[in-house]
Amino acid sequence: MAPKAVLVGLPGAGKSTIGRRLSKALGVSLLDTDAAIEKQTGRSIADIFAIDGEEEFRRIEEGVVRAALVEHDGVVSLGGGAVTSPGVCAALAGHIVIYLEINAEEAMRRACGSTVRPLLAGPDRAEKFQDLMARRVPLYRRVATIRVDTNCHNLGAVVRYIMARLQAQLATPVSGGDRKSSEAERSGAPLRKSSEVVK
């Protein structure tokens, strides 16, 4: 058993919203790993960060992600920082991983007003967000098999594009390390160097 798709991206990229729409379009369920962590621990993510620290949160998160990749056959939406765990990145190998790309200005507009993102809490949120981008974007690109620009506000177009890419991938199944190469060849783009753009 494996997910139909795994969504990754920065806070504000639309993982939850697009995940719900994509899972509905595919006729499957959505598993949000942040929600799964809160259900498993009986605590909020903010509480885990505040009391136990980020390292403990990432340990819990890795376990939840690994279980989801084995047990869930729908769509899986990962927390924005999940890819900072080497174990998570390793576990994503061989899965269809969709990186929801977003520019800094739009991401900050969507995310920095949130009160439920522990790493963006307090003052200097814009600076903190820029730091998150610098550390995480290379990791998203590394694990992604499909990259989608979500800066446009037409979520329907984003979901339709993802559906088309998933259908193309299912029509030409590839395994493990060959998948990223196959994706790049079909898009006509250099491997991991260009974005799949939705207008």
UniProtKB/Swiss-Prot annotation:
Segments for region (Disordered):
174-199
Q: Which organism is it from?
A: Mycobacterium leprae (strain TN)
Biased composition regions of type Basic and acidic residues, renumbered to the chain: 177-186
Alphabetically, the GO molecular function entries are: ATP binding; magnesium ion binding; shikimate kinase activity
- Give an example GO biological process: chorismate biosynthetic process
User: Which keywords does this chain's UniProt record carry?
Assistant: Amino-acid biosynthesis, Aromatic amino acid biosynthesis, ATP-binding, Cytoplasm, Kinase, Magnesium, Metal-binding, Nucleotide-binding, Transferase
What gene does this protein come from? Answer: aroK
Q: Which residues does the record give as ATP binding sites?
A: G12, A13, G14, K15, S16, T17, R117
> What's the protein called, per UniProt?
Shikimate kinase
Similarity field: Belongs to the shikimate kinase family.
Tell me which residues bind substrate.
Answer: D34, R58, G80, R136
Q: What's the EC number here?
A: 2.7.1.71
Q: Where are the transmembrane segments?
A: none
GO cellular component, as recorded: cytosol
Q: In which pathway does it act?
A: Metabolic intermediate biosynthesis; chorismate biosynthesis; chorismate from D-erythrose 4-phosphate and phosphoenolpyruvate: step 5/7
Q: Where in the cell is it found?
A: Cytoplasm
Q: How is the subunit organization of this protein annotated in UniProt?
A: Monomer.
Binding annotation for Mg(2+): S16
Task: Give the matching Pfam families.
Answer: SKI
Where this protein primarily resides, as one coarse class? cytoplasm
> In this entry, which stretches build a coiled coil?
none
Function description: Catalyzes the specific phosphorylation of the 3-hydroxyl group of shikimic acid using ATP as a cosubstrate.
